[in-house]
Amino acid sequence: MSTLQEEIFNSIKEMKSKSPLVHNITNFVVMQITANALLAVGASPVMTFEKEEFEDMLSIASSLVVNIGTLTKTSIEAMHKACETANKKNVPFVLDPVGAGATKLRTKTAIDLIKNYNPKVVRGNASEIMVLAGESIKTKGVDSTANVNMALEAGKHLAKEYNTVVSISGETDIITDGNKVLYVSGGSPLMPVNTGMGCTSTAITGAMLAVSNPLIAAASAMCIMASAGEKASKKSEGPASFAVAFIDELYKLDINDAANRVKE
């Protein structure tokens, strides 16, 4: 096991031992899925959109997850308030710019949150990351039309410009701080046909941010997803059985197997 892999191993182990409270402002489609995933890996999720609660909640939460999947004017206001409060309290947050590039509102919302509040990690698919880096690319709703390798330079640019870590999901996941690049292999072809897999990656990134620096947190989350996804696919006949097996595999996670999936 390399030094990097040992760091991933220890970070996941620490997250499980600390069971951090993760405040999620996520989308309505995946809320139950991501809450169950966080519980399965050992974290403690809370889902609240109410601005009046943020001061109290972010005083006890270890990290914040902001996911723009189901945007409304009310949710946009809540996201800005949550990020502002998190910054004030030094609570790290991860942003998932779901569907950036699909509509002007989504793109603007994501860019505003990045520029104004400096997320520790931006986690998205290749198309979303390329759009946020200023590249012109057609998107297909919330799904990517680009492969992860196409987005590497965009990810580096975005990371350097905003002093953040960019995590790009694909057949091989790429994580970069603008200089260092990490690769995570594994997962399953059944993951893209299950709603919420990217959002789950972001939620687990939030859990890992509670105990790790942003680069290790982002890589650890993708290692967890890759390991659980690959193992679940071997026990599944299709998307429905995979969804159940995936949560089970998160719960039974082989930390050693997960950590060994990362390389530089």
From Swiss-Prot:
CC cofactor: Mg(2+)
InterPro entries: Hyethyz_kinase (IPR000417), Ribokinase-like (IPR029056)
GO biological process assignments: metabolite repair; thiamine biosynthetic process; thiamine diphosphate biosynthetic process
Enzyme class at the top of the EC tree: transferase
Listed EC numbers: 2.7.1.50
Catalytic activity, reaction form: 5-(2-hydroxyethyl)-4-methylthiazole + ATP = 4-methyl-5-(2-phosphooxyethyl)-thiazole + ADP + H(+)
Annotated binding of substrate, by residue: M47, G196
Keyword Protein transport: no
Protein family (similarity comment): Belongs to the Thz kinase family.
Task performed by this protein: Catalyzes the phosphorylation of the hydroxyl group of 4-methyl-5-beta-hydroxyethylthiazole (THZ).
Protein's name in the database: Hydroxyethylthiazole kinase
Gene label: thiM
